[in-house]
Design a protein with these regions (language model features):
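Active-site SXXK
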Residues: 26, 52-77, 172-177, 245, ...
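Short, conserved catalytic-motif segment at the N-terminal edge
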Residues: 2-53, 73
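Short, well-ordered beta-strand elements
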Residues: 30-32, 64, 299-317
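Short, gly/Ser/Thr-rich active-site loops of penicillin-recognizing serine hydrolases
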Residues: 282, 318-337
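Short, surface-exposed loop or secondary-structure junction motifs
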Residues: 31, 91-294, 298
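Catalytic tyrosine of NAD(P)H-dependent dehydrogenase/reductases that use a Tyr as the general acid/base
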Residues: 51-54, 162-164
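Short beta-strand scaffold segments in enzyme catalytic cores
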Residues: 19-22, 279, 300-301
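Short, glycine/proline-biased beta-turn/loop segments that scaffold the active-site neighborhood
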Residues: 75-90, 195-196
Length: 337
């Protein structure tokens, strides 16, 4: 029997501003929620609140590429130069390597964070990301990123190892739009959100019902608003609710939408680091992915052996130490199931 008491107790202990659910193949087994989606409007954060997923969005970008591969619209082992000749190292890299974070392409967010940190030395990473990503919401912004990446060598030889880089999935999202002649949001809606009845899920952080906040200022008890933004890149722009993410978790557990071969590819971890939108969880035997954009945080852990998924959304960081402690206790709880 799943220890739902222990699950609730850990969440009560840390009082995260957000909500979390435990899901099996058919039902939401348990949920917990606390705090505000919007402090100014006094709107509580619930399992129906839409919030930014950040890099958890990469699962959908990866699966979109896999759908197009199955349909013969692209090839995973084709060189990136086939789809993005403007990138100077594109002839050395394949889409498969990008999906596995094994391309060596530097992380554009790290490059831009370093630049903005000198302009805003007292700002948190959450706050710094706002002006960076706000400037990248259209084709001109994407081309600026490619121009920036063209100024830097690869971090390592392709397929040498796996190292996390948002650039891979920003570019993959762009390739989807180029091949399909659809916006990424329309493609996701047609192939994922509508078939799974994920009616509260959209591409574009501007659609989040929850506002995003920096760490709570405990000196005066006031919140520091970061905002929703309007980011739409393939590396981290989906917004969703826990009710909809339960449907996504169940689709993964049932292996819907993709072919059996495509699911096998997506879930295979390479270089002991990354699958295609999946990583090894802190809990042995589980898979996971997290996400962070502006003040939004997301955590997704799933076990095929247990046929369970745990998903959490926050719109304000409890602070790095509290977040790590909560993650560690939750990982230990999952391991004991």
């Amino acid at each position: 029997m799943t220890d739902l008491t222990g699950y609730q107790a850990i969440n009560e202990k840390y009082q995260l501003n957000g909500a979390t659910i435990l899901v099996d193949r058919q039902h939401i087994l348990s949920h917990w929620q606390s705090g505000m989606a919007d402090f100014n409007k006094r709107q509580p954060f619930t399992i129906h609140t839409t919030s930014g997923l950040g890099s958890l969005s990469k699962q959908l970008t990866a699966d979109s590429i896999l759908l197009l591969n199955t349909a013969g619209k692209l090839r995973l082992d084709a060189p990136l130069a086939t789809y993005l000749p403007a990138y100077r190292y594109a002839d050395q890299i394949t889409l498969r390597q990008m999906l596995h974070m094994a391309s060596g392409i530097p992380d554009y967010t790290e490059l831009l964070l370093a630049e903005y940190a000198t302009k805003m030395p007292d700002a948190s990473e959450s706050r710094l990301s706002y002006p960076i990503l706000e400037g990248l919401h259209d084709e001109d912004g994407f081309q600026q990123v490619i121009a920036l990446l063209n100024q830097h060598p690869l971090d390592f030889s392709p397929d040498e190892k796996g190292v996390y880089s948002n650039s891979n999935y920003l570019i993959l999202g762009h390739i989807i739009t180029q091949i399909t002649k659809m916006s990424l949001g329309d493609f996701l809606n047609q192939h994922f959100f509508k078939p799974l009845a994920m009616t509260q899920t959209h591409l574009g952080t501007q659609y989040a019902a929850a506002n995003s906040y920096d760490d709570l200022d405990f000196t005066n008890g006031r919140t520091k608003v970061i905002g929703r933004g309007a980011y739409q890149g393939g590396d981290g722009a989906v917004v969703s609710s826990l009710v909809d993410l339960a449907k996504w978790a169940q689709a993964v557990l049932h292996q819907k939408i993709l072919s059996t071969t495509a699911w096998r590819e997506a879930l295979t971890i390479t270089h002991d680091f990354y699958g295609m939108g999946w990583m090894q969880s802190q809990t042995p035997g589980w898979l996971s992915h997290g996400g962070h954009i502006f003040g939004y945080w997301a955590y997704f852990d799933l076990s095929f052996d247990k046929q369970l998924a745990q998903i959490t959304l926050n719109n304000m960081s409890p602070g790095a130490e509290a977040r790590k402690a909560w993650q560690a206790e939750m990982a230990a709880w999952r391991a004991a199931l």
